[in-house]
From Swiss-Prot:
Pfam families: Enolase_C (PF00113), Enolase_N (PF03952). The lineage of its organism: Bacteria, Bacillati, Bacillota, Bacilli, Lactobacillales. The gene is eno. Its cofactor is Mg(2+). GO terms for cellular component: cell surface; extracellular region; phosphopyruvate hydratase complex. This is Enolase. Catalyzes the reversible conversion of 2-phosphoglycerate (2-PG) into phosphoenolpyruvate (PEP). It is essential for the degradation of carbohydrates via glycolysis. (2R)-2-phosphoglycerate binds at Q164, K341, R370, S371, K392. The keyword Lyase applies. It comes from the Bacteria. One of its GO terms (biological process) is glycolytic process. Keywords: Cytoplasm, Glycolysis, Lyase, Magnesium, Metal-binding, Secreted.
Length: 441
């Protein structure tokens, strides 16, 4: 047993230059851990509360000094000298009870999560084991198939593309190191194609390109060209994933989806489902995130009934990494995958519970970054610890994204011959026939 002897928090900056929270945990045997918290641009209505100061004279109101004070003055007093650093569940539960709200609005999910991560890292440090091994034990061996966001749109950019993310997934790679190479080579091939066509190659929040396109289909055509230019086969070697972020397009009053940034076209829900199905039929699209507004549960069940056997349908804003919402979705047959964002729920313990619930229901779980990131690589360890099988951590540029990929390379090297990269088989929520059909496109 090793008690926590000190907890320290401070305000630092994220990848967008906005303030965020960093916490450090120190133990009586010299264990040390640090946790940094990301933040999102496109956030779900039901996410745990990210506590900000609201003082417009400082960081435009986005300061985190209140959350820092909650760690230093409230959480530290409750945990220091009272908890064994290796008792993650007890530490997280104590902070949840200390907050006492449904959405962690009193202390802030950012304050709680920073300490949750730092405690896990301190425990791993004290025991002399990698974080993934500490969190997952001897059964942690699956390296994830990456979702690489190489074209940004929607709330993540200033262009005329409605969909928020266009991603490549190296489903045919033999290892995660090779998957990262496939992605990097395709990223650079895409840049050359854009430059040759006179399009901008500046990057968005997550490191992907954000040039203007005529509509939402043009980026898909560029991805196919880039995959081929890099020497790979679309579908077989590299599949495509998209994040529609449809809550940004939905008008609840008229119950329609409007392509507000591109063509201005409006769709009823059945028409929008058909629109997405048509794209999935014509391109090797293996995953669609948030295809339906986060509050339209019956419509989610409808799209899952129509498309869920042939494409992964991911709930992000829909589930917000919350087991209550996930269980409701499972009961209704809504979605077949959940996006896991640790700061949507606020503790590692609750994150593990969401991943386990998803797996038991046959849903995939995709461990994800946020658009406002830091150099913290916890999600790389988390995805291996849970054998989740898929990770979404941005493009092949910007150090805040690359840090996660580099950590996966290190983990694969540590695991050596026990490491498994599932690739196309990480989509266990799809039938073998559906996986084969995507790879044949």
């Amino acid at each position: 047993m090793s008690l926590i002897t000190d907890i320290i928090a401070r305000e630092v900056l994220d990848s967008r230059g906005n303030p965020t929270l960093e916490a450090e945990v120190i133990t009586e045997l010299g264990g040390f851990g640090r946790g940094m918290v990301p933040s999102g641009a496109s956030t779900g209505e039901h996410e745990a509360v990210e506590l900000r100061d609201g003082d417009k004279s400082r960081f435009g109101g986005k300061g985190t000094t209140k959350a820092v004070a909650n760690v230093n003055d409230v959480i530290a007093k409750a945990l220091v000298g009272k908890f064994d650093v290796t008792d993650q569940r007890a530490i997280d539960q104590a902070m949840i009870e200390l907050d006492g709200t449904e959405n962690k609005g009193k202390l802030g999910a950012n304050a709680i999560l920073a300490v949750s991560i730092a405690a896990a890292r301190a425990a791993a440090d004290e025991l002399g084991v990698p974080l993934f091994s500490y969190l997952g034990g001897a059964n942690s061996y699956v390296l994830p198939t990456p979702m690489m966001n190489v074209i940004n749109g929607g709330a993540h950019s200033a262009n005329k593309v409605d969909f928020q993310e266009f991603m490549i997934m190296p489903v045919g790679a033999p290892t995660v190191k090779e998957a990262i190479r496939y992605g990097a080579e395709t990223f650079h091939a895409l840049k050359k194609l854009l430059e040759a066509d006179g399009k901008a190659t500046s990057v968005g929040d997550e490191g992907g390109f954000a040039p203007d396109f005529a509509d939402n289909e043009e980026p898909l055509k560029y991805l196919i060209r880039a995959i081929e230019a890099a020497g790979y086969k679309p579908g077989k070697d590299i599949a495509i994933a998209v994040d529609v972020a449809s809550s940004e397009l939905y008008d609840a009053a008229t119950k329609t989806y409007k392509l507000r940034w591109s063509t201005g076209d409006e769709f009823t829900t059945p028409e929008f489902i058909k629109y997405l199905e048509d794209l999935a039929d014509r391109y090797p699209i293996i995953s669609i995130e948030d295809p339906i507004d986060e509050n339209e549960w019956e419509d989610w069940a409808e799209i899952t009934s129509e498309l869920g056997k042939k494409v992964q349908l991911v709930g992000d804003d829909f589930f917000v990494t919350n087991t209550q919402y996930l269980q409701k979705g499972i009961n209704m047959g809504a979605a077949n995958s959940i996006l896991i964002k640790v700061n949507q729920i606020g503790t590692l313990t609750e994150t593990f519970e969401a991943i386990e619930m998803a797996k038991e229901a046959g849903y995939t779980a995709i461990v994800s970054h946020r658009s406002g990131e830091t150099e913290d690589t916890t999600i790389s360890d988390l995805v291996v610890a849970t054998n989740a099988g898929q990770i979404k951590t941005g493009s092949l540029s910007r150090t805040d994204r690359i840090a996660k990929y580099n950590q996966l390379i290190r983990i694969e090297e540590l695991l050596d011959t026990t490491a498994q990269y599932k690739g196309i088989h990480s989509f266990y929520n799809l039938s073998a026939a559906a996986r084969e059909a995507i790879q044949a496109k």
